Every structure is written in structure tokens, then in C-alpha cells.
Amino acid sequence: MSSTSKVESAKKLAAYKAVDENFPKDAKVIGIGSGSTVIYAAERIGQLDNKDSFICIPTGFQSKQLIIDNGLRLGTIEQYPDIDIAFDGADEVDPQLNLIKGGGACLFQEKLVAASAKKFVVVADYRKKSDKLGQSWRQGVPIEIVPNSYSKIIQELSKKLGAKNVDLRQGGKAKAGPIITDNNNFLLDADFGEIEIDNVGKLHEQIKLLVGVVETGLFTNMANKAYFGEEDGSVSVWSK
């Protein structure tokens, strides 16, 4: 099996097991996140016999399409602010279930859905496990900001909070200029190196206090469980 096939198999195993072990029989509202592993979670949820009995809330355009493609009922967070359970991926997870999210540029809506859920379950493959955030995810902490504040925030992240490097995320070949989020904001990626487990919450709060910051990609005290598909075909589970 190629390394790519092995990773995809790991993602599917983790997502299916997470849905099978956590999906409430009486669920009415489900959060569906974004990312490559959530594709399999949505697929598994779409196989449920009672899929017409609950509403699914997306975290962005991609997850909205996943909900539609799997024949699930689509709702909005405005209509259904109380969510029974949410499934989402992560860019990196530490042993305390702190997360870095936002590599796919949907972090505000992902955090809104996670914060609205009674239970939040993360699905990922073995590459996303780390002893500390920033250990394997080297792109930095994603930060969603109001567009005209980007110069000042970049300055303050570096001078006040000690970021080693801060980049305004660009659209690359697909788009000239910065990436625009689903909320019409910009994204920064701030490199703080490896973040000590005890400092994740403090760093999130410090960033949030900067004028113009909408949300950070640091998710702390939110996830209840994380499922990781392993290289050997097993699934490991971290829980709080």
C-alpha cells in the first residue's frame, strides 16, 4: 500500500469509528466540519438509516457540499444554535486535546460550531498527533482578522507576543492577493514555535485581545475525544 493510500485508509478508519461510537441515537442537530478526514465522517453519517431525522450544520462551503452530497438535511447555525454533537478534523492535536485548526481557512465557523456542541469529536490520522502544538504543524497558528487591521496585528504579534514570523496568507495560483475567508476576512499564520501545553489557553487569550482579531485557530478546552487512524490499521482514541 502506498503512503497516500495508507493515510487515506487511516482517515476513513478514524472517522467511521468516531461516528459509530459517538453518534447519539436521538440526535436532532449535528455539526459537520471541514477537511479531508471529515469527508469520511460525513460519508458514514450519510449511511445511517435515520438520516432524515436530524439536521446537519456546516462549518463552511466545503462541509455544506459534503452535507448535500451525502443526502443529509442542511441547516444553519442561526436556525439551530444548539448542537448535539460535532465532528471535525484538526491540523494538530496535543495530549490535552488542544488543537490547531484553520489550515483550510474556516476556523471561525469551525469554532462557532464546536462551541455550540454538547460534544465535540475530532477525527484525524496519525500524522496529526504531537506532544506539543507547533511540533509537526510548522505553518503557524491561523488567525482570522478584519482586513484593514493586518499591518498593526502583524506588528503586535511579533513585538508584543514574540511570534517568530507572521504571514498574511495568500491565495497562491488560485487567487491573486490574500485568501478571503467565508466571513470576508483575512488570515494570518503566526509562528510561535512549539507551544507548551499549559500556555495554549493563555496565548489564545493574548491574541484575541488584539484589536481586529476575529478568532484564533487555537482550540482549547473544547474537544471531548480525538480519534486517530494509525499506520497499522488500528484506531487510537484520546479523551479528557
Swiss-Prot record:
User: Which Pfam families does the annotation name?
Assistant: Rib_5-P_isom_A
Top-rank taxon of the source lineage equals Eukaryota
InterPro entries annotated for this entry? NagB/RpiA_transferase-like, Ribose5P_isomerase_type_A
Per UniProt, which keywords does this protein have?
Cytoplasm, Isomerase
Question: What are the protein's GO molecular function terms?
Answer: ribose-5-phosphate isomerase activity
Record has Isomerase as a keyword: yes
Pull one GO CC term from this UniProt entry.
Answer: cytoplasm
- What is the protein's known function? Involved in the first step of the non-oxidative branch of the pentose phosphate pathway. It catalyzes the reversible conversion of ribose-5-phosphate to ribulose 5-phosphate.
- The UniProt record gives the binding positions of substrate as S34, G35, S36, T37, D88, G89, A90, D91, K101, G102, G103, G104, K128
Q: What is this protein called?
A: Ribose-5-phosphate isomerase
**Active site, UniProt feature:** E110 (proton acceptor)
Give, as in the UniProt entry, the pathway in which the protein acts. Carbohydrate degradation; pentose phosphate pathway; D-ribose 5-phosphate from D-ribulose 5-phosphate (non-oxidative stage): step 1/1
Q: Where is this site: Plays a direct or indirect catalytic role?
A: D88
Look up the EC number in the record and give it: 5.3.1.6
BP-aspect Gene Ontology terms: D-ribose metabolic process; pentose-phosphate shunt, non-oxidative branch; pyridoxine biosynthetic process
Reaction(s) the record says it catalyses? aldehydo-D-ribose 5-phosphate = D-ribulose 5-phosphate
The keyword Hydrolase appears for this protein: no
Say which family it is in: Belongs to the ribose 5-phosphate isomerase family.
Q: Where in the cell is it found?
A: Cytoplasm
